[in-house]
């Protein structure tokens, strides 16, 4: 697993992916901080994280679409499976590498509440609690993106399905209002959803 982790991190830091991801995340955090914490003088940093959470729709597919789909497309996945490591080690190594890439800009963001606290009252406990929740949500979406990437070798399809799944995750509560609360209605909705996903993957 360590070998896969080192290899993946080396690949990320020798490409633009990690830098573009980090730059976009920090730019949007900066915009959110300016709008809420500076212009409106709001002491809650969690509002900023709530504001920027929708960027996962674009960033997660970009970050995850190549993880396994590219391996299948170039047939290098067979080389990985021939190594004296388990499939679990390969997946965990790739996943941990993505988490490191995601965590790096968040370490920088972690200093924002402390900086704002020097100029006013900031709720540090809720700010860092929200930051941890933000990381957990990102980690979950990255795991979903990795799974989708494993289903196809088409990078565009992997990204498109990931965008659809992330959007569904955000708006599932709103969509629930349009679905019957009865058992039969729920089963029909689930079957339709499974068929749609199956057709997309096919």
Annotated model-derived regions:
Residues 2-6, 88, 92, 96, ...:
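Alpha-helical membrane-protein architecture signal
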Residues 56-63, 138-143, 190-199:
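Hydrophobic cores of alpha-helical transmembrane segments in multi-pass inner/ER membrane proteins
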Residues 1-70, 200-202:
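Hydrophobic alpha-helical transmembrane segments
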């Amino acid at each position: 697993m360590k070998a896969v982790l080192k290899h993946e991190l080396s690949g990320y830091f020798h490409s633009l992916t990690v830098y573009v991801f980090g730059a976009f995340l920090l730019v949007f955090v900066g915009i959110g901080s300016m709008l809420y914490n500076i212009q409106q003088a709001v002491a809650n940093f969690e509002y900023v994280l709530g504001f920027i959470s929708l960027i996962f729709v674009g960033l997660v597919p970009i970050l995850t679409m190549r993880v396994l789909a590219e391996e299948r497309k170039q047939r290098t996945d067979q080389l990985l499976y021939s190594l004296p490591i388990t499939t679990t080690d390969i997946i965990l190594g790739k996943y941990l590498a993505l988490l490191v890439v995601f965590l790096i800009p968040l370490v920088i963001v972690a200093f924002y509440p402390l900086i704002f606290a020097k100029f006013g009252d900031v709720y540090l406990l809720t700010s860092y609690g929200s930051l941890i929740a933000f990381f957990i949500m990102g980690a979950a979406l990255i795991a979903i993106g990795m799974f989708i990437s494993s289903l196809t070798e088409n990078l565009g399809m992997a990204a498109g399905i990931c965008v659809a799944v992330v959007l569904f995750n955000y708006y599932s509560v709103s969509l629930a209002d349009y679905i019957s609360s009865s058992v039969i209605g729920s089963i029909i909705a689930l079957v339709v959803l499974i068929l749609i996903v199956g057709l997309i993957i096919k």
